[in-house]
Curated annotation (Swiss-Prot):
<dbReference type="InterPro" id="IPR036702">
    <property type="entry name" value="ComB-like_sf"/>
</dbReference>
<protein>
    <recommendedName>
        <fullName>Probable 2-phosphosulfolactate phosphatase</fullName>
        <ecNumber>3.1.3.71</ecNumber>
    </recommendedName>
</protein>
<dbReference type="GO" id="GO:0050545">
    <property type="term" value="F:sulfopyruvate decarboxylase activity"/>
</dbReference>
<keyword id="KW-0460">Magnesium</keyword>
<dbReference type="Pfam" id="PF04029">
    <property type="entry name" value="2-ph_phosp"/>
</dbReference>
<dbReference type="InterPro" id="IPR005238">
    <property type="entry name" value="ComB-like"/>
</dbReference>
<dbReference type="GO" id="GO:0050532">
    <property type="term" value="F:2-phosphosulfolactate phosphatase activity"/>
</dbReference>
<keyword id="KW-0378">Hydrolase</keyword>
<dbReference type="GO" id="GO:0000287">
    <property type="term" value="F:magnesium ion binding"/>
</dbReference>
<comment type="similarity">
    <text>Belongs to the ComB family.</text>
</comment>
Length: 237
């Protein structure tokens, strides 16, 4: 089975099989936390405007712009906040700067799209392995069009675990991600050095980084199940 890592989304990229979308700080971590809190479904929209179109008393709007909760949204993009949110049985509509856009890029061609992070790394890798017939691709959201150390490190953790689950043929991007993972024995160190973590510190949200650095603490894997309008519908596997 081929193992591929793309460090940022690209319009020219196509995915024939399974894609693990990674935005570890913070969207894919927060997505798993919402499912842990009992959310029925996650609607991932490509823009804040398309998210606001779903605004309703039975819907929770969550997201960020510049790291902060957007106007008229109910919640930000904090996994700590998500885990304690009153979302049981409810739909959570999410829009973020990088993660939701990466998911839309993957969904253009992939058979299966999963949201992965360190938080649900082992569960996400196992499910990807079960679903894949020819390739598992790990798509890093990056930060505003640039590669992110945090996502690349997470891709390395996923790639390593996929290798433990069975024989894989890593492409160059996967080899780079594995090298990054091996260079940082401590997940928190790797994430803390990233531009995404530094940006959170600037807006006083650095406490989210240790949460995002937890490895394999959740079995909740958001899987793409359909669409409504511009939104991708993710539910727990």
């Amino acid at each position: 089975m081929r193992l591929r890592v793309d460090v940022i989304p690209g319009e020219h990229l196509a995915y024939p099989d399974v894609v693990l979308v990674v935005d570890v700080i913070r969207a894919t971590t927060t997505a798993a936390a919402f499912l842990e809190a009992g959310a029925e479904a996650l609607y991932w929209t490509p823009s804040l405007e398309s998210a606001l179109a779903f605004k309703d008393e039975d819907v929770v709007l969550a997201g960020e712009t510049g790291g902060l909760k957007p106007p008229r949204f109910d919640l930000g993009n904090s996994p700590r906040e998500a885990l304690s949110a009153q979302v049981a049985g409810r739909v959570v509509v999410m829009s973020t700067t990088n993660g939701t856009k990466a998911a839309h890029a993957a969904a253009r061609t992939a058979k299966h799209v999963l949201l992965a992070s360190l938080y649900n790394a082992h569960a996400a890798a196992r499910l990807a392995r079960e679903l894949a017939t020819e390739e598992v691709a790990i798509l890093c959201a990056g930060k505003e069009g640039r590669a992110g150390l945090d996502d690349l490190y997470t891709a390395g953790v996923l790639a390593e675990y996929l290798g433990f689950l069975g024989e894989v043929e890593p492409e160059d991007g996967a080899r780079v991600a594995l090298a990054v993972k091996r260079a940082y024995p401590d997940p928190l160190e790797a994430l803390s050095l990233s531009a995404a973590a530094l940006a959170l510190k600037q807006v006083g949200l650095e406490a989210d980084v240790p949460f995002c650095a937890q490895v394999a603490k959740s079995a909740a894997v958001p899987v793409l199940r359909g669409r409504v309008g511009e939104a991708l519908i993710f539910k727990r596997a």
